[in-house]
Amino acid sequence: MASADDRRFEVLRAIVADYVTTKEPIGSKALVDRHGLGVSSATVRNDMAVLEAEGYIAQPHTSSGRVPTEKGYREFVNRLEDVKPLSGAERKAILNFLEGGVDLDDVLRRAVRLLAQMTRQVAVVQYPTLSSSSVRHLEVVSLSPARLLLVVITDTGRVDQRIVELGDVINDEQLGRLRVLLGAALDGKKLSAASVAVAELAEQSDDDLRDPITRAATVLVETLVEHHEERLLLGGTANLTRNAADFGGQLRTVLEALEEQVVVLRLLAAQQEAGRVTVHIGHETAAEQMIGTSVVSTPYGAGGAVFGGMGVLGPTRMDYPGTIANVAAVAMYIGEVLANR
């Protein structure tokens, strides 16, 4: 849309705003009455005719009004100059709620719950990817002479606890050596390399530690390998049914896409530029199941590192300014919370 068509864009913007609010096709008289466009209904009708001819709006079969198309929503999003700012109270409430999380899992669970409530859409968060996580620390705790607790803490704040049943008892001196060996093998290593390092420990250890090292290594390898990338947290899936009519009979396929996770993970995994919010509208998701759906997403992380992607999924009839602001704010505060851990 050329810059000379600013008035027509104002008409388009008004149509998008009203349709998102009312769910009803919008007519020229309603636009003039609600938005004070400074022109007559006839002029607005002419502008709407041009917008329709250019594919920005369309006429539903049963109405004399018009609704935005994917192209119309894209133009609206591309020309957003301001997103709705959150109030100081809202920002403080977000931070306080996320800070209440006891570990990474809890923080992310709180984030999806909060984002779903704020946007009344489906919130999605990708767990930190295998390639981006390292072992910050391994703690080895003796529960009994023949039983150990292993606590793996990653730099992304994830904590895993596993029990190791030993075949025989070990004394404090052996426990100390075991702790040193495991720590040296794991501390600071990427998870993708840590499982290999710990698997090789048994061959390098003293005879009296070979069996306990083997047992501990088996448990650790299982733990480390479970930190895969295909983990997605969802919140607010019930919001889809509230907006079922907006999906034009495609709700089942959207639910299937969420269950399969592949499409959503692909969109989230593409988020690598910190602070940037991306909007995919309808066919831009490159997935047949997601027609009629928009995804607003951004990366989250801490200390300059991107841990994963997060965002909101809903119908194309979405409050884009508000959703963009909420997604950006929650991602920013997740980063603050994780950076301070």
Swiss-Prot record:
Superkingdom to which the source organism belongs: Bacteria
Regions annotated as coiled coil: none
GO biological process: negative regulation of DNA-templated transcription
InterPro entries reported in the protein's UniProt record: GAF-like_dom_sf, HrcA, HrcA_C, WH-like_DNA-bd_sf, WH_DNA-bd_sf, WHTH_transcript_rep_HrcA_IDD
GO molecular function, one term: DNA binding
Keywords: Repressor, Stress response, Transcription, Transcription regulation
Matches recorded under Pfam families: HrcA
Function description: Negative regulator of class I heat shock genes (grpE-dnaK-dnaJ and groELS operons). Prevents heat-shock induction of these operons.
UniProt family annotation: Belongs to the HrcA family.
NCBIfam families documented for this protein: hrcA
Protein name (Swiss-Prot/TrEMBL): Heat-inducible transcription repressor HrcA
